[in-house]
Amino acid sequence: MKLTIFKKVSPLLLCGVLLLGPTSCKDFLDEEPPSNLTPDNFYTIPDHAEAAIASVYADMRSGYDGAGIFSSSWQLLEAPTGTSTTETAQNSDLNNLYSLVYDGNTQHVINWWNSSYRIIAQANQVLAKVPGITPMDEAVKKRILGEARFLRSWAYFNAVRLWGDVPLITEPQTIESEDFFPTRAPQEEVYKLIVDDLIAAEAAGLAWMDASGRVSLAAVKSQLARVYLTMAGQPLNKGAAYYKLAADKAYEVITYANANPGVINLFP
């Protein structure tokens, strides 16, 4: 009797398992891990904004990454000038820098290029995502966006002076982005973004000095003076008008420093 009942019930149970099994497994496997963060679900609270801008600052350190034995990436900015020398015979990339025979395969060039566009990419994320975080103190939000603008302009200023025309990327990129493989933009356009970013940072309510090492108003104004000075000469040749812009902006820093020696002491 027991055997007969089992034979009748077993097919019914099997059918139920087959019907319910796929649905149950699918629901189980589709669970969203709550600890996984992506650009789409990360920027939701003010702490995320602070963490995001911190990541941009962190990427600035990559300019000091190693570039082979006894060498760092920053030497790309010094070796080709002819104002320094080295006795490191073991590093062919570094020797090529000093011999002015380096190219896109030289480790220092690769590192500095990647570093510049990591900073730009992270800053673009901050500028695109942080404005949508609510609730958030508007003054803090404005400060963070100003810092991101400065850091992006800093990276582009280095890139345009090193390589001339460079890709001009101002939005977060995905594989679906239309400009995922961007072409090089004219230097004039790159400098326009640099100036626009610095002017926006200048109006972001930054403190004149920040002991924590964050971007300060003094840094923004000083960098803007430097950019104007560069634009006045080669290759843009903006001339006297930009020399005056540079002088006026630098004078703002000097004037404030003289009036507030306890804040900015340029000549201790």
Short names for language-model regions:
Residues 25-75, 101, 243-246, 267-268:
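Membrane-proximal, proline-rich intrinsically disordered regions
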Residues 32, 160-171:
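Short, well-structured active-site flanking segments
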Residues 50, 58-64, 88-163, 179-192, ...:
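Conserved, well-structured interaction surfaces
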Residues 1-34:
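Bacterial Sec-dependent N-terminal signal peptides
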Residues 40, 67-88, 169-171, 206-219, ...:
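Short, surface-exposed recognition loops and adjoining beta-strand edges that mediate ligand/DNA contacts
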